[in-house]
C-alpha cells in the first residue's frame, strides 16, 4: 500500500489513505508516506452511511483515495463470512478494487487465482490487478494475458525488494516511527 501511495505522490497527485479495520499502525505508515492523515474504515463498527461519510470526509480535496484492505479480499469474521471484510467495505462504499496478487514464481497460475476472485461472489468490484513479486520481464506478458483473457486491467507490479522489507517484532507490528 505504501508503495502505491508513494507512486501516486510521485505523479503529483493529492492522495488520501484509509485502512479497512481498526488497526492504527497501517494508517501511521500511510500518513508518513503521503504527509496527511489516514483514517480507518471498519465495516464491523460503522454502518454504510457512516463509512461513506468518513470516506468522503477523508477524501475531501484529494485526487484519489487508496483504501488498504484487511487479510484476504473476502476474509471476514469467523472464517466463513465476508462480514467486516474488504469485499464488504468495497460494496458499502461503492469503491473500485485493485487486487494485489502474489505472482512470485508463477505464470498462468496467477490468472487462475485472479479468475477465482472474479468468479467467487457477484459484484466483486475488482477492476484491476497488481502483480506482487514478479519481474519486469514476466510482468509484460502476464499483463497482456490478464487483460486479454480476464478483461481486468493490469495496473503494475511490485518486484521482490529484500532491502525494503520491514523487520517485525511482537506480532509483526512495527510503527512508522521505528522505520
Task: Please tell me what each predicted stretch does.
Residues 1-2:
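Glycine-rich phosphate-binding P-loop
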Residues 5-93, 101-125, 136-141:
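ATP-dependent carboxylate-amine ligase catalytic core
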Residues 108-179:
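Internal gly/pro-rich beta-alpha loop/helix module
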Amino acid at each position: 500500500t505504501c508503495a502505491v501511495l508513494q507512486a501516486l505522490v510521485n505523479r503529483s497527485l493529492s492522495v488520501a489513505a484509509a485502512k479497512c479495520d481498526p488497526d492504527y499502525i497501517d494508517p501511521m505508515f500511510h500518513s508518513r508516506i503521503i504527509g496527511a492523515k489516514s483514517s480507518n474504515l471498519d465495516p464491523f463498527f460503522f454502518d454504510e452511511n457512516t463509512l461513506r461519510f468518513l470516506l468522503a470526509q477523508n477524501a475531501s480535496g484529494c485526487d484519489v483515495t487508496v483504501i488498504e484492505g484487511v487479510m484476504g479480499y473476502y476474509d471476514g469474521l469467523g472464517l466463513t463470512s465476508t462480514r467486516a471484510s474488504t469485499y464488504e467495505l468495497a460494496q458499502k462504499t461503492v469503491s473500485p478494487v485493485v487486487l494485489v496478487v502474489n505472482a512470485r514464481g508463477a505464470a498462468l497460475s496467477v490468472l487462475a487465482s485472479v479468475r477465482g476472485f472474479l468468479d467467487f461472489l457477484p459484484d466483486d468490484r475488482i477492476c484491476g490487478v497488481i502483480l506482487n513479486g514478479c519481474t519486469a520481464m514476466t510482468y509484460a506478458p502476464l499483463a497482456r494475458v490478464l487483460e486479454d483473457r480476464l478483461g481486468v486491467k493490469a495496473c503494475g507490479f511490485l518486484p521482490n525488494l529484500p532491502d525494503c522489507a520491514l523487520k517485525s517484532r511482537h506480532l509483526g507490528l512495527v510503527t512508522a516511527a521505528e522505520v
